[in-house]
């Protein structure tokens, strides 16, 4: 044991430091992304949105954080207390764990593993367990029904996302996220990114990501008219905050995945000066914000789907379309001699 720490202590300290720094930056960015979500929703409805706490309401999210932390957590009398309190922690930790392999710039990644895409798909699939645990342990019919809805919804749309990812992997020949970004680097700039040749898959990914993260118009899990607040109806205080945090981290993760798969990651839209002078992490952040803007606009202007419409879209439209695109992309790459070696 002593020999292990003698040879691996500094690498371990560096990884822990990187993880803490990423966690802090991610949580701060989530605070302002949540504020932007509320501001966009307010602008569409011709309102001002949060504008009291701090200049232009910039400290509103931190005030909400303080409110949640100081409130007393309550556990229903018939609930399974251990599972009830563990569920939000599982959801939040799994959402944060995905960022261990996401590169925000060339070489700026905690773990540059060769199966990064597979890792993210696996972690995002596990997040449904936190929701199932919350629904079952609450000992209430509304959270349990919402948890069952969420499980069916997430499983349905993960299939489509998987086929979308396969289309990109066929073009790249690698599961490494850094390799996917570098494969889009060309003299054509943004016209060489995969959003253009794989545009149908970009649309499928965007809509499936909305459903995967339970965002409007697919927020059937939190349908206020039917299920009150969904699987979170019995939660308050810090456990509720962890659920909200996990939800928004998952949304930003999907935005980052869309950026890496289709929008060139940290690559500039025009591969010439002065665009190349801008740091890659700035381009990455701007593209993630663009993806989140699409998420926010869908929440603001699209009415909620019925549950049968949601399932029909996933199984009868997206699944055949994405499967057909996998076959078409593979055939085109093979016959055109463009398949990666």
Swiss-Prot record:
Enzyme Commission (EC) number: 7.1.1.-
Subcellular location: Cell inner membrane
Highest taxon of the lineage: Bacteria
An MF annotation (GO) of this entry: NADH dehydrogenase activity
Any one GO biological process: aerobic respiration
Top EC class, one word: translocase
Record Pfam families: NADHdh
Chief location of this protein within or outside the cell: membrane
Keyword terms: Cell inner membrane, Cell membrane, Membrane, NAD, Quinone, Translocase, Transmembrane, Transmembrane helix, Ubiquinone
Transmembrane segments: 13-33, 82-102, 115-135, 161-181, 190-210, 248-268, 277-297, 317-337
Catalytic activity: a quinone + NADH + 5 H(+)(in) = a quinol + NAD(+) + 4 H(+)(out)
One GO location term (cellular component): plasma membrane
Membrane topology type: Multi-pass membrane protein
Family in the record: Belongs to the complex I subunit 1 family.
Role description: NDH-1 shuttles electrons from NADH, via FMN and iron-sulfur (Fe-S) centers, to quinones in the respiratory chain. The immediate electron acceptor for the enzyme in this species is believed to be ubiquinone. Couples the redox reaction to proton translocation (for every two electrons transferred, four hydrogen ions are translocated across the cytoplasmic membrane), and thus conserves the redox energy in a proton gradient. This subunit may bind ubiquinone.
PANTHER family per UniProt: NADH DEHYDROGENASE SUBUNIT 1, NADH-UBIQUINONE OXIDOREDUCTASE CHAIN 1
Quaternary structure (record): NDH-1 is composed of 14 different subunits. Subunits NuoA, H, J, K, L, M, N constitute the membrane sector of the complex.
NCBIfam families: PRK06076.1-2, PRK06076.1-6
Name this polypeptide is given: NADH-quinone oxidoreductase subunit H 2
Source species of the chain: Rhodopseudomonas palustris (strain BisB5)
Gene encoding the protein: nuoH2
């Amino acid at each position: 044991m002593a020999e292990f720490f003698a040879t691996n202590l500094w690498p371990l300290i560096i990884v822990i430091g990187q993880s803490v720094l990423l966690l802090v930056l991610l949580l701060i960015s989530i605070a302002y992304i949540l504020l932007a979500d509320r501001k966009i929703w307010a602008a569409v409805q011709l309102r001002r949105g949060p504008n009291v706490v701090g200049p232009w309401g910039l400290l509103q999210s931190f005030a909400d954080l303080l409110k949640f932390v100081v409130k007393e957590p309550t556990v229903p009398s018939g609930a399974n207390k251990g599972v009830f309190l563990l569920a939000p922690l599982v959801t939040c930790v799994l959402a944060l764990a995905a960022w261990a392999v996401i590169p925000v710039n060339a070489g700026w990644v905690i773990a540059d593993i060769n199966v990064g895409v597979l890792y993210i798909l696996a972690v995002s699939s596990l997040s449904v367990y936190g929701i199932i645990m919350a629904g079952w342990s609450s000992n209430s019919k509304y959270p349990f029904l919402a948890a069952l809805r969420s499980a069916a919804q997430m499983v349905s749309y993960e299939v489509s996302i998987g086929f979308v990812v396969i289309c990109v992997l066929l073009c790249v020949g690698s599961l490494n996220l850094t390799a996917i970004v570098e494969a889009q680097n060309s003299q054509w700039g943004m016209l060489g990114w995969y959003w253009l040749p794989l545009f149908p898959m970009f649309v499928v990914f965007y809509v499936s990501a909305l459903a995967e993260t339970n965002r409007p118009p697919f927020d059937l899990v939190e349908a206020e008219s039917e299920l009150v607040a969904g699987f979170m109806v019995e939660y308050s205080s810090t456990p509720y905050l962890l659920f909200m945090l996990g939800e928004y981290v998952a949304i930003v993760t999907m935005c980052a995945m869309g950026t890496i798969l289709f929008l060139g990651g940290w690559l500039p839209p025009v591969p010439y000066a002065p665009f190349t002078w801008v740091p890659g992490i700035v381009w990455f952040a701007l593209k993630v914000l663009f993806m989140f803007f699409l998420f926010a606009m869908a929440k603001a202007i699209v009415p909620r789907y019925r549950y049968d419409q949601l399932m029909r879209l996933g199984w009868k439209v997206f699944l055949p379309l994405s499967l057909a695109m996998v076959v078409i992309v593979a055939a085109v790459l093979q016959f055109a001699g463009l398949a990666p070696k």
